């Protein structure tokens, strides 16, 4: 798991003897089964060791490719490889099939999904259609090993499409081969072979894997005989880790996430008609991508990168003299320089200074530029003037309002005297991500809400603006504001590279620990990258903060899931002494109302991940996306604001639908103001109760319940209640659901011994265990 040579090489050497680091994701062997079906053996030693029957991986062929789920057909722990069987059906699979032995796949992450439930059922029919035989094979092996009698049916349109027959026969007691045209085996479809076995002897269970229509008819057949039948669903996915909800389906009347709850389900409970419709969600977008396939293959590597982007012009003033003062001197309220500052202006004079206004891009400009940051940053002159407003309180209540207890007066007073680098050092001493926090933290509800100015009915000091200014200044100067400490020799693992994981990594690195951060996605940053748009938090800002952690000694590994790719026990064997789980609350909530699984209704997580992380709006990338023209965003938080403002930049007419009034909106006031300036419509005191789909299964209308406010609830906000009999039906072609998130179950399901508490959060006791 450890991206740099020391850690990852040790793990690979432990699990797969002497495999070099450079061979990861290498195509070791490629075999062509038919015109469009290929078998790949790919080097992935950690996945090969940990995979089980029924698991899948997510593949990203190259940097512009979408994330594609593929079920693992086999694994060789000695060679450190996994086997995948791929059929050319879309752009990503076609790109993969064009690769040759010796080529590398950009990303392989897994094993994912819940493994097949294996026990001695008795007599089991295993039915595979087309490439479905490949994921069926490891299940056949596992069931046979458990003592079952295995009767296998493999089918294809013709002889050329029958795959893995010899391997299936090796682990089966009997095998029937079916071809549609009778060119090999018996003529007919897979259900004929299944029914032949049913008539031959008692069948305890059926496992069917293949095209969805095949699995549906298998279930209809076995349902007549009351035979339990499991199917494996290969649905649309983006992340594959339970983060987005793109793979959701109705199973037994309830919404399930295929990547977490599946991919195998009781076929009798699957809403097949819904699945068929959802599988066609991006058909038009994928067709367009396929038309430009040759352009994708031939295009030179000219992808834009923001990492070296020019810094904002605001605040790029000439640097103040570099300070040699110690951190204690920078923070000492009784230092002579600090006393002189307090004497230089009377409190009334400081109170009389007007709060600084953040320079912003005009609404007309910014809605046409998706990746340009709206807030442009303040200049040195503006920052020093705002810093003078700070009263340098002896008992600063603003610090009490900060979740990480930043010494706010000290960093602000350093700005006032022109020692910006010193201010950055004070910030970095407590906060690992000041450039991020200065942009996205809800200061008006935290530090600024405790500012003494508010007690005088004056605007709070712009602490967030000043934090951003100092952090950006340090980034531009390129100075390391925190020295790398001497190592204490203790290794700690951080699960997740979002704001929580990165902050913890920074805190531990500053204390001399050897920190290793493990991320399931292909990009470091978590929600900072997939969730927050660049017009609010540019990627290059996050990248610099990550690079600062690397300079402190932190190491990062992507495409690795703790508990699945590598277990806690294996990490303990590698010498890790502590583990921090920062996997976040990434499971999107849905409202569970009629029609919610219609095409073009997606979670804000999925929508923002496609646009932000996968850059689906860029024609150079492969991730498909449907861009609505009349978009509803459900919710009133920051994620709802990010979603509606993103949709606006993609050309939509956007309406926020929120069940309370604007006064109760949890979003930052600045985000609400920006949304209004950009032309977002607000429909407050309304709540969706049903979605209506057209004949293709795509949403076309939303039925909204009109609400009114009642008494305050536990959050202090007035509770919404429906006005009986009063509804409003509105037209829409895309709905983005942003009604909150829950803890992602992937990590608790993958790590043994974790205790779950309220709302499935991980229980942590006073002993920090």
Give the label of every model feature segment:
Residues 20-101:
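Ferredoxin-reductase
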Residues 91-239:
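FNR/FR-type flavoprotein reductase catalytic core
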Residues 135, 212-213, 234-264, 295-311, ...:
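Local cysteine-cluster metal-coordination motifs and their immediate loop/turn environment
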Residues 157-166, 514-517, 521-552, 556, ...:
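Rossmann-like dinucleotide-binding cores of NAD(P)H-dependent redox enzymes
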Residues 223-225, 367-386, 407-439, 457-484, ...:
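Ferredoxin-type iron-sulfur electron-transfer modules in oxidoreductases and energy-metabolism complexes
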Residues 486, 491-495, 543-593, 690-703, ...:
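Feature captures the FAD/FMN-dependent oxidoreductase FAD-binding
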Residues 491-515, 640-648:
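N-terminal Rossmann-like FAD-binding beta1-loop-alpha1 element of flavoenzymes
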Residues 597-628, 712-769:
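FAD-site-proximal beta/loop scaffold in flavoenzymes
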């Amino acid at each position: 798991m450890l991206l740099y040579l020391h850690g990852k090489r040790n793990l690979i050497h432990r699990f797969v003897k002497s495999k070099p680091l450079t061979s990861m994701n290498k195509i070791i062997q490629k075999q062509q089964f038919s015109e469009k079906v290929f078998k790949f053996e790919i080097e992935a030693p950690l996945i090969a060791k940990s995979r089980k029957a029924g698991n899948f991986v997510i593949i990203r062929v190259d940097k512009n490719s979408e994330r594609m789920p593929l079920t693992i057909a086999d694994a060789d722990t000695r060679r450190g490889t996994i086997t995948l069987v791929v059929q050319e059906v879309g752009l990503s699979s076609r790109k993969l099939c064009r690769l040759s032995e010796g080529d590398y796949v950009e990303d392989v992450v897994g094993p994912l999904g819940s493994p097949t439930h294996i026990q001695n059922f008795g007599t089991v029919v295993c039915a595979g259609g087309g490439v479905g035989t490949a994921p069926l094979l490891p299940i056949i092996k596992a069931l046979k090993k458990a003592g079952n009698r295995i009767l296998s049916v493999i089918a294809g349109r013709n002889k050329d499409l029958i795959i893995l027959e010899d391997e299936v026969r090796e682990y089966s007691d009997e095998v029937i081969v079916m071809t549609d045209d009778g060119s090999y085996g018996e003529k007919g479809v897979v259900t004929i072979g299944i029914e032949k076995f049913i008539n031959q002897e008692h069948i305890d269970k059926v496992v069917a894997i293949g095209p969805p229509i095949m699995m549906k008819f298998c279930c209809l057949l076995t349902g007549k005989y009351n035979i339990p039948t499991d199917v494996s669903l290969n649905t649309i996915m983006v992340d594959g880790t339970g983060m987005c909800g793109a793979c959701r389906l109705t199973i037994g009347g309830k919404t399930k996430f295929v990547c977490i709850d599946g991919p195998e389900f009781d076929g009798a409970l699957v809403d097949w008609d819904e699945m068929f419709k959802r599988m066609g969600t991006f058909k038009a977008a994928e067709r367009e991508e396929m038309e430009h396939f040759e352009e994708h293959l031939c295009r030179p590597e000219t992808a834009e990168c923001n990492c070296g982007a020019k810094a904002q012009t605001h605040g790029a003033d000439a640097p103040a003299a570099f300070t040699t003062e110690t951190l204690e001197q920078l923070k000492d309220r009784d230092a002579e320089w600090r006393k002189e500052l307090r004497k230089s202006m009377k409190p009334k004079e400081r109170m009389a200074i007007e709060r600084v206004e953040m320079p912003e891009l005009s609404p007309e400009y910014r809605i046409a530029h998706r990746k340009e940051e709206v807030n442009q940053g303040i200049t040195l002159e503006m920052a020093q003037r705002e810093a003078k407003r700070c009263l340098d309180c002896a008992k600063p209540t603003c610090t009490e309002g900060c979740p990480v207890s930043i010494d706010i007066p000290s960093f602000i007073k350093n700005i006032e005297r022109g020692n910006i680098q010193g201010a950055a050092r004070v910030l970095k001493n407590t906060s690992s991500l000041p450039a991020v926090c200065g942009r996205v933290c809800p200061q008006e509800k935290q530090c600024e809400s405790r500012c003494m100015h508010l007690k005088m009915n004056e605007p709070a000091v712009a602490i967030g603006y000043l934090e951003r200014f100092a952090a950006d200044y340090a980034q531009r100067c390129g100075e390391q504001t925190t020295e790398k400490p001497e190592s204490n020799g203790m290794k700690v693992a951080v699960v997740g590279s979002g704001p929580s994981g990165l902050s913890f990594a920074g805190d531990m690195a500053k204390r001399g620990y050897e920190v290793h951060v493990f991320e399931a996605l292909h990009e470091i940053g978590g929600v900072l990258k997939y969730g927050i748009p660049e017009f609010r938090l540019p990627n290059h800002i996050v990248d610099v903060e990550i690079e600062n952690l690397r300079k402190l000694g932190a190491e990062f590994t992507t495409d690795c899931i703790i508990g699945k790719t590598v277990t806690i026990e294996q990490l303990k064997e590698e010498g890790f002494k502590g583990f921090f789980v920062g996997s976040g609350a990434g499971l999107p909530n849905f409202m569970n109302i009629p029609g919610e699984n219609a095409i073009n209704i997606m979670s804000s997580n999925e929508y923002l991940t496609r646009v932000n992380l996968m850059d689906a709006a860029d024609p150079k990338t492969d991730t498909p996306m449907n861009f609505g023209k009349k978009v509803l965003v459900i919710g009133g938080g920051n994620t709802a604001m990010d979603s509606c403002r993103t949709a606006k930049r993609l050309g939509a007419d956007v309406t926020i639908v929120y069940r309370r009034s604007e006064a109760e909106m949890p979003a930052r006031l600045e985000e609400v103001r920006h949304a209004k300036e950009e032309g977002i419509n607000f429909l407050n005191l309304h709540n969706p109760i049903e979605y209506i789909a057209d004949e293709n299964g795509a949403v076309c209308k939303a039925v909204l319940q009109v609400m009114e406010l009642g008494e305050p609830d536990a959050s202090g906000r007035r509770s919404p209640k429906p006005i009986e009999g009063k509804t409003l039906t509105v037209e829409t072609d895309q709905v983005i659901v942003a009604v909150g998130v829950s803890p992602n179950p992937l990590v608790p399901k993958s790590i043994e011994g974790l205790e779950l508490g309220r709302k499935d959060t991980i229980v942590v006791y006073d002993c920090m265990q």
